[in-house]
Structure formats: structure tokens, C-alpha cells
UniProtKB/Swiss-Prot annotation:
Native source organism of the sequence: Haloferax volcanii (strain ATCC 29605 / DSM 3757 / JCM 8879 / NBRC 14742 / NCIMB 2012 / VKM B-1768 / DS2) (Halobacterium volcanii)
Principal EC category: ligase
Binding site for ATP: 278, 285, 301, 330, 370, 444, 450
Protein family membership: Belongs to the ATP-dependent DNA ligase family.
Protein's UniProt name: DNA ligase
Lineage: Archaea, Methanobacteriati, Methanobacteriota, Stenosarchaea group, Halobacteria
GO molecular function: ATP binding; DNA binding; DNA ligase (ATP) activity; metal ion binding
Its EC number(s): 6.5.1.1
Residues in coiled coil: none
Length: 585
């Protein structure tokens, strides 16, 4: 497939506001992609590598701007590109605004055709670029990018620039790709037509939707296990549902972590009768893989390879386990007395690439495994939680401190006592899990509940925001929050404490944009400064010290609750209150 065709189809998808129509357009693109299908399935999400692969292009905005400037001609600098970015708001629009070398040459001679880029070429060049390292690698990357941009027309440049910076954002999420793969290769054309036909009778449409949902479920199962949209798209086309059903876990290829909702013991017991209760550690999620050759790999919650940062965990697993396994758990920081240290301490170790040996002496970490997804050739995702935990215990031993305790209880008082013990030991709280539930990668359903002590919310002033992308480009989306600093003069100042984008529906985004847009004082690209006037009530899991924000604090996992229409900026929470809450944690 020519990259120009990919760009044209991506532009068509970006311009389409209707979700079903987007799926249809994407389905057509997949059907026409030929041998490039796996690559196209990744490109539409702004990916060059599969979701499970933590390899990155390692290209910062400045390097991309330099490449665009070089392709645009000798009179254009990276600073010029950044000036246009401030005016136009996103890198794709900036790249599309220049006439690059190849296009200038064609215009000058008025004849002939430049060899167009193909999707395969772009993929190959970007993969080679990602592999560049060591002395001179930055210049190598710059030359590669220059060579690509120099062969693009404006539409191609728009989507190449976005792809390079992983900012494709054409309104295509993982669910959209899943549905489009199903529609392209598994759903009968007659069923797809019946679903879209307003005149189809109800029975025909219902039957078509049921078959479509079954096809989508088959794609979803394969994606849960593989985390590779390109591979799954190819299997769906070439082997159908039978091929998808054959996808299995692969040691060394991480899957998305199963996630939890907030909940209570009453919720758990009311739903399941008996709950599996575990300690909720104040650590970092980690997925442990040991292959048949004894090699151990560790992956973060975001599937980033963190093996080199945690050598003591690697050593423990290598010595404790003989068979290929995939485990889920957390790594926790411990003091010399075996007491847990705060989350900030584990961050000093997690993802560290340098001075690992020195930091190992300063911050000791240990594994706390709570699930087993694969053991000795057996995929265990479909097994009940209780059975998976039994397999985990058999692997690591009944008395191993690396195995998280599991209490099966239908007694609220017993669960409350377990929670009190966990809190007294310095942990975050407890997890409540359905003992009969399978492991569902990437799912934040009702089978796992996190129960932590209630924390207060904060009423914070909105002092900035960012415009969204794609179909959300007309809405403000990420909001900068500030705490009030009381001044003797009576003219309060505001110090930043974090950003919130979680817990806000599309309808609320529209309402918040209408509320805040009149208060915009300055715009620079996507970022806007907002006059302190609107107060958000914000929930959070913890207040942390942080140099990132001017207050010296940051909210861990902030979430939007509501607009405090009864409050003004002058009556919002003060930085003094933030400090008191932080001290009381």
C-alpha cells in the first residue's frame, strides 16, 4: 500500500464523527491493506511496534522539528517549526504546511513522478531508526526522518509527523480497531448491512448484531492474550475465528494487567457471597515471565521492560521457579526491619537504567506475587482465581513471603479485621476479588475491587487546560489544578498541584469547555491559561511531594468529581490544607 493512500484514508477517518461509520471506514482500509495489514493496524493507533513491545522510536519533539525544518529547506529552522506549532496547535498540521524537497522538485520541473513512499518503507525505516544507538545515533535518526519527510506530500507529512511522535489520534482507539477487524474479516456483509439499514426488520437486525458481537468477542479474546493488533488482524483475515481461538499466552510477551474498581466488603459479599481478600500493597505492578531457558523478564503495568532495574527480583525468580511461568504481582520497597516504605521509594528503583547497583543498596525491593497466569505450558486465564492462587503457592511455596496471602471469607467482621491488620502493617488497604472469576487482561470490571480508607476530596482552582485531539479537538480536556495561597494583602496567589483528565464524560467535557472558554487568558498551541475562577472537587489516592508542580505537591491518581458551583477561587482549598492532609497520611 502506498503511504499516500494510507494518509488519505486516515484523513477520511479523522473527519468522520459517527462511530459506526468510522468502524466501516477502518474495516474497508483493513480489507484493502494486503500484505501491509499488520502494519496498518498498528499505524492507525500511532504505533510502530506491537502494544506488548516496549521498544520506542526515542524521538523527541525537537528532533522531529529539526527533520521537518531540514526537509522544508535552508531558510527554515526548528525554531520556525515550533513557532508554527504554537500557532497551529498540533505537529501534523505544521508538517502539512510545508512544501518539502521532493514536492518542490516536481513543481520546478513540471513533469515526472517522484517514487512514492510505501507503508512498508515507512515501517522499515522507522524500525531501523529505533535500533540506532550510540555515538552518532541522533544524526542517523535525523537523516532518516529527513529522508522520509523529503518524499512526502502534505497529507503524507501530516500523518508521518503524528506517527513519529505517537500522536496519530484520528479517533481510532483499541475498541475501534477490534470492531473493524471483526467487521472486515469475520462479519458477513449481509449482517453488516442489516445493522446499518434503518429499514431492516427488528428480528433480522438483532440476529445480525448477535453474530457481530460473537465475532468481536473472538477478536477481543485473541487481543487479550497477544496484545498485538497487527498479528490478530492477520490471523482473522487468514484463518478466521479458528485461528483466533488458537492464540495462546507466550512467555516473554506481556499482557495487559487486570484492574480493579473501588468497592466495599458489602459490595463484594452481596455480589459473590464469599470474597477472596488480599493485602493491597503500596508498590508498583509487575508482570513476571520466566522462560524455558531460565531467562527472567519483568514488565511494568504499561508493559515496559523493567528487568534491568530490579536485579534482586530477577535473581529470586530464577532461583525459586523451575518451569516457564507468567506471574502477576507488585514490587514493594522495604526498610531494613522488613516494614513497607512509601510508594515514592519504589519509584527511585522502577524503570531506572543507571546506577542500579548503588540504588539497590539504598532501596531494597521485594516481590509480592498474587496471581499465576501461566505455568509449565498451561494457560490459566480461564481458571478461577482461587485455583490460580493455589498454583502460585505450589510454585513458590506455602511459606514464601513472595506470595501474597489470600483469605476466603463470607464474614464482614473477619474481612474488617484483615483490613485493620493490613493498615497497621503499613499497607494501603485490601483487595476484594471474586474467587470464581477468570483473569481478564485489561479489564476493569467488578470481579476485582480495591478497598482503601476513605480520603477527603480537595476543592481546587482550574488555572489551565489543554485542547483535545481528533474528535475531541473542540473540547478542553486536561485541566491544570492549583491550590490557593493565602496572602496578607488579600490578593491570593495560586500554586499548581496537578492535572486531571480522569472521570470526565464527553458530555461533561462539552459543558466544562462552555464554562471555561470565556475565562481563557492566553493560548499557546494546545495549552491555555485560565483565569482562576472555576473550582473543581477532585478525588485522589494520595498527596505526594513533587518538584513537578509549583506547590511542591502532586496528587496521585486524581479524578474529577464535580464542579463546585458554590465556591469561588477565593474560597477554594488552601495550600496549608494540602500540607496538613499530606502530613496526616
Amino acid at each position: 500500500m502506498q503511504f499516500a493512500e494510507f494518509a488519505a484514508r486516515a484523513a477520511e477517518i479523522e473527519a468522520e464523527p459517527a462511530d459506526l461509520a468510522v468502524v466501516s471506514l477502518l474495516s474497508d482500509l483493513f480489507s484493502d491493506a494486503g500484505d501491509d495489514l499488520p502494519t496498518v493496524a498498528r499505524f492507525v493507533q500511532g504505533r510502530v511496534f506491537p502494544a506488548w513491545d516496549s521498544t520506542t522510536l526515542d524521538i523527541g519533539p525537537r528532533l522531529c522539528h529539526e527533520a521537518i525544518a531540514r526537509a522544508a529547506g535552508p531558510n527554515v529552522s526548528a525554531d520556525d517549526v515550533e513557532d508554527r506549532l504554537a500557532d497551529r496547535g498540533e505537529i501534523g498540521a505544521v508538517a502539512a504546511s510545508y512544501d518539502f524537497g521532493g514536492q518542490r522538485g516536481l513543481a520546478a520541473f513540471g513533469s515526472g513522478e517522484q517514487d512514492g513512499l510505501t507503508v512498508a518503507e515507512v515501517d522499515s525505516e522507522l524500525r531501523a531508526l529505533a535500533a540506532a544507538s550510540g555515538s552518532g545515533s541522533e544524526e542517523t535518526k535525523l537523516k532518516t526522518l529527513y529522508g522520509l519527510f523529503n518524499r512526502t506530500d502534505p497529507d503524507e507529512a501530516r500523518f508521518l509527523a503524528r506517527l513519529v511522535l505517537s500522536e496519530m489520534r484520528i479517533g481510532v482507539g483499541e475498541g475501534t480497531v477490534r470492531d473493524a477487524v471483526a467487521e472486515a474479516f469475520l462479519v458477513a456483509p449481509a449482517d453488516a448491512a442489516a445493522i446499518r439499514d434503518d429499514d431492516a426488520d427488528a428480528e433480522t437486525e438483532a440476529a445480525a448484531r448477535e453474530r457481530r458481537n460473537e465475532a468481536i468477542a473472538a477478536v477481543a479474546r485473541a487481543l487479550q492474550v497477544s496484545n498485538d493488533y497487527g498479528m490478530v488482524a492477520g490471523l482473522a483475515r487468514d484463518e478466521g475465528e479458528a485461528g483466533l481461538d488458537g492464540v495462546r499466552l507466550e512467555v516473554g510477551r506481556p499482557v495487559q494487567a487486570m484492574l480493579a474498581q473501588a468497592g466495599t466488603a458489602a459490595d463484594a459479599l452481596g455480589e459473590w457471597g464469599t470474597a477472596a481478600v488480599e493485602t493491597k500493597f503500596d508498590g508498583a505492578r509487575v508482570q513476571v515471565h520466566r522462560d524455558a531457558d531460565g531467562e527472567v523478564s519483568l514488565f511494568s503495568r504499561n508493559m515496559e521492560d523493567v528487568t534491568d532495574a530490579l536485579p534482586e527480583v530477577v535473581e529470586f525468580v530464577a532461583g525459586a521457579v523451575d518451569d516457564p511461568v507468567i506471574l502477576d504481582g507488585e514490587v514493594v520497597a522495604m526498610d531494613d526491619g522488613g516494614e513497607p516504605l512509601p510508594f515514592q521509594e519504589i519509584l527511585r528503583r522502577f524503570r531506572r537504567k543507571h546506577d542500579v547497583d548503588r540504588m539497590r543498596e539504598e532501596v531494597r525491593v521485594e516481590l509480592r506475587a498474587f496471581d499465576c497466569l501461566h505455568a509449565a505450558g498451561d494457560d490459566l486465564l480461564a481458571d478461577p482465581l482461587a485455583a490460580r492462587h493455589d498454583r502460585l503457592t505450589a510454585l513458590l511455596g506455602d511459606d514464601s513471603p513472595a506470595v501474597s496471602d489470600l483469605l476466603l471469607s463470607d464474614d464482614p467482621d473477619e474481612i474488617a479485621a484483615y483490613e485493620a491488620d493490613a493498615l497497621d502493617a503499613g499497607h494501603e488497604g485490601i483487595m476484594l476479588k471474586n474467587p470464581d472469576a477468570p483473569y481478564s487482561p485489561g479489564d476493569r470490571g467488578k470481579n476485582w475491587l480495591k478497598r482503601k480508607p476513605d480520603v477527603e476530596t480537595l476543592d481546587l482552582v482550574v488555572t489551565g487546560a489543554e485542547w483535545g485531539e481528533g474528535r475531541r479537538a473542540e473540547f478542553l480536556g486536561t485541566f491544570l489544578l492549583s491550590a490557593r495561597v493565602e496572602a496578607e494583602s488579600g490578593d491570593d496567589a495560586f500554586e499548581t498541584i496537578g492535572k486531571v483528565a480522569t472521570g470526565i464524560t464527553d458530555e461533561e467535557l462539552a459543558e466544562l469547555t462552555d464554562l471555561l472558554e470565556p475565562e481563557i487568558e492566553r493560548e499557546a498551541g494546545k495549552e491555555v491559561d485560565i483565569r482562576p475562577s472555576v473550582v473543581f472537587e477532585v478525588g485522589y489516592e494520595e498527596i505526594q511531594t513533587s518538584p513537578t508542580y509549583s506547590s511542591g505537591y502532586a496528587l496521585r491518581f486524581p479524578r474529577f468529581v464535580t464542579v463546585r458551583e458554590d465556591k469561588t477561587a477565593e474560597t477554594a482549598d488552601s495550600l496549608d490544607r494540602v500540607e496538613r492532609l499530606a502530613d496526616s497520611q
